[in-house]
């Protein structure tokens, strides 16, 4: 969702609460739980999962390896669930022509830098830059070039915008900010 008037442009970013992240976290949790249950049932000698009789999988080395994979998968799954819960990467970009200020806000991981807030004067913006990498994993990213600060990404690398969409977005933003567009 975006909001735009003659003097203010606010663009909201979704962050890590995407359907694909929910699916991956859920699949990884179920798979790693299955591995851990099979490894545990081979150690106990009892069938905790009816699909695999415990006699078919001996504890050393298969049961140990499956238990290790299960524990590692649970850690990775919990990491994904935490990023979804904290909504890491969400925030907004606010461009205010009236006050001549650009504000960029993102949520990060808990701790000292949980809230990432950047402010710039519009006169410090050199250009809007489009970086295009073609190939099997094509990537198109929109950057804002700031004098003395470098380039700040405005779109996510996994957003996969079409060439027309990224050009349209860059043109509208460059027109709004009254800066040139660079393509790399």
Curated annotation (Swiss-Prot):
Function description: Seems to be required for the assembly of the photosystem I complex.
Protein name as catalogued: Photosystem I assembly protein Ycf4
Family membership: Belongs to the Ycf4 family.
The UniProt record lists the keyword Ribosomal protein: no
Protein location: Plastid, Chloroplast thylakoid membrane
InterPro entries per UniProt: PSI_Ycf4_assembly
Alphabetical keyword list: Chloroplast, Membrane, Photosynthesis, Plastid, Thylakoid, Transmembrane, Transmembrane helix
Record's keyword annotation contains Nuclease: no
GO cellular component terms attached to this protein's record: chloroplast thylakoid membrane; photosystem I
Domain of life: Eukaryota
Chain ranges passing through the membrane: 19-39, 57-77
């Amino acid at each position: 969702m975006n909001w735009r008037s003659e003097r203010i442009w606010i663009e909201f970013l979704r962050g890590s609460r995407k359907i694909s992240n929910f699916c991956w976290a859920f699949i990884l949790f179920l798979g790693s739980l299955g591995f851990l249950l099979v490894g545990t049932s081979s150690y106990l000698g009892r069938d905790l999962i009816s699909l695999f009789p415990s006699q078919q999988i001996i504890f050393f080395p298969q049961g140990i390896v499956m238990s290790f994979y299960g524990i590692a998968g649970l850690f990775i799954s919990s990491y994904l669930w935490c990023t979804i819960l904290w909504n890491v990467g969400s925030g907004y970009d606010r461009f205010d022509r009236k006050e001549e200020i650009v504000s960029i806000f993102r949520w990060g991981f808990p701790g000292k830098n949980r809230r990432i807030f950047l402010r710039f004067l519009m006169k410090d913006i050199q250009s809007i830059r489009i970086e295009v990498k073609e190939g099997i994993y094509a990537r198109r990213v929109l950057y804002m070039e700031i004098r003395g600060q470098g380039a700040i990404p405005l779109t996510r690398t996994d957003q996969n915008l079409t060439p027309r969409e990224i050009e349209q977005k860059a043109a509208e933003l460059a027109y709004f900010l009254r800066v040139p567009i660079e393509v790399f």
